[in-house]
Structure formats: structure tokens, C-alpha cells
Amino acid sequence: MVEFTKRLLLERNFERTNRPITGPIVVHAVAGAGKSSVINTVSLTFQLICWTTLPEEKASFNCLHLRHLDGPAFPGAFVDEYQLADTDLSEAAFLFGDPLQYPGPAAQVPHFVKLFSHRCGLNSASLIRELGIAFEASKLDSVQHLDPYSSDPEGTILAFEPEVQAALASHSLDFLCLDEFRGKQWPVCTLYVSTKNLCDLDRPSVYVALTRHYERLLIMSFDAADTSA
């Protein structure tokens, strides 16, 4: 099973790093890279129970044999979002994670990594790289920066800043907060933020918000009309 998974990772264009393999094999992937697909393929092929540090209902993929990890990892276990674990993972076979999306104290140097997203497009990738994040894509997508006072939202509405959420709620606008949209995806999203300078915001939250769409993203910045900036 371990060799099968290693071959599968290489077939799915995960790159082997120069870290020697000792202990659990650590796999890092950006949002939309296909990490969940690898786990699901292994689970279905071997009828393997896979584990996640997240509550099962918040897991980023549907897996018939997915369970929440609430103790030390079992020998040979496959653990998703391992970096959030506060328990012993030394007996696991594979540790999967996206530390950019779920920062955690247990993050390790990976044995395999994939920086290419099949979900996001070129415009999104360029915006994400401005945050100092290595991120690649090849398909076309649309990213628009708009004035929230003169433009209407489309698709799923996202907001992670408390003051922005309060403003949207005051206008009876339905939106999803970070815990609700993390791990999910939609064709079109509208992201409301306090400033067009995304580098000034919490980087993990921005990263998650910028990687929820797979066709089109509208970014509504409340300082968009401020010409003094």
C-alpha cells in the first residue's frame, strides 16, 4: 500500500523532495492540487479507513471510510490535515496537509509536494503569489476587483473579517464565514474584504478565500473607492 501510494503521488505530479524517508511520509499540497483525490483513491482501492484531524462534517472531501482522529495515529494510518494534530502521529504511514490553509504547530518538512492547482486559474495564481505563496495553475479564470457600493455580488459570498461580516449582516446579505467556506468550492464566488491591499490581511484566511472558486472570483474591497490610497 505504501509503494502504491508513492507511485500514485508521482503519477499525479507530486514532486519528491530531498528529505530522506524516515517515519511517516509527509505530503503537502496547495488547494486544488488533488490531495483529497489521492487519499480517496487509496481508501477505495484498499478499503482503508482514513483519518482527519478535522470534524468529519468539515472534511474537505467525501470519503466512504473517513473518520475523525481523536487519539494517537494507528500503525499504517493515513492522516489528513495532520498539522493540526495534538497527538502522536509517529506510527502513521502517510501524513497529508496544506499548512497554508490549515496552519498548525505540527507541520513538518514534506517528502512530497505539489504547488500546482487544478481548481484555480492563472489570474488567481498570480494574485496568490503576490501574498508570497508559491502557487501554480494553467487554466484560464476570471478575477475582478470591484467597488462594493456600485456592484452586485455573484455566486457564493465569502467574508472572514469581523467588521466586514458585520457590515454585510447590517445589509441583510447572506455570506459564509471562514469555517463555513474552508474546504469547499463553487464556480463563482464574491469575496468582501476591508482593503484592496490583500497583503495587509491575515494570510491564511486570504489564501483560503482566494481558492474557493474554479471559474470566477469577484473581490469587493470597501476601500476600492478611496483614491487617496
UniProtKB/Swiss-Prot annotation:
CC terms in the record's Gene Ontology section = host cell cytoplasm
Q: Where does the (+)RNA virus helicase C-terminal domain start and stop, copy by copy? A: 115-229
According to the lineage, what is the superkingdom? Answer: Viruses
Cellular localization per UniProt: Host cytoplasm
Q: Which cysteines are joined by disulfide bonds?
A: none
Tell me, in one coarse class, where this protein mainly resides: host cell
Which GO biological process annotations does it have? symbiont-mediated suppression of host innate immune response; transport of virus in host, cell to cell
GO MF entries: ATP binding; RNA binding
Q: Quick check: keyword RNA-binding in the entry?
A: yes
Q: Which residues form the (+)RNA virus helicase ATP-binding domain?
A: 1-114
Q: Tell me the InterPro entries matching this sequence.
A: (+)RNA_virus_helicase_core_dom
Q: Where is the signal peptide?
A: none
Regions crossing the membrane: none
What UniProt keywords apply to this chain's record, in alphabetical order? Host cytoplasm, Host-virus interaction, Inhibition of host innate immune response by virus, RNA-binding, Suppressor of RNA silencing, Transport, Viral immunoevasion, Viral movement protein
The keyword Transport appears for this protein: yes
Protein family (similarity comment) = Belongs to the Tymovirales TGBp1 protein family.
Q: What else is known?
A: TGBp1, TGBp2 and TGBp3 seem to act together for cell-to-cell propagation. TGBp1 is the main movement protein that physically cross the plasmodesma with the viral genome. TGBp2 and TGBp3 would facilitate TGBp1 function.
Its annotated function is as follows: Transports viral genome to neighboring plant cells directly through plasmosdesmata, without any budding. The movement protein allows efficient cell to cell propagation, by bypassing the host cell wall barrier. Increases plasmodesma size exclusion limit. Acts as a suppressor of RNA-mediated gene silencing, also known as post-transcriptional gene silencing (PTGS), a mechanism of plant viral defense that limits the accumulation of viral RNAs.
State how it assembles.
Answer: Homodimer and homooligomer. Interacts with capsid protein. Interacts with host AGO1; this interaction targets the host protein for degradation, thereby suppressing the antiviral RNA silencing.
Entry protein name: Movement and silencing protein TGBp1
Organism annotation: Strawberry mild yellow edge-associated virus (SMYEaV)
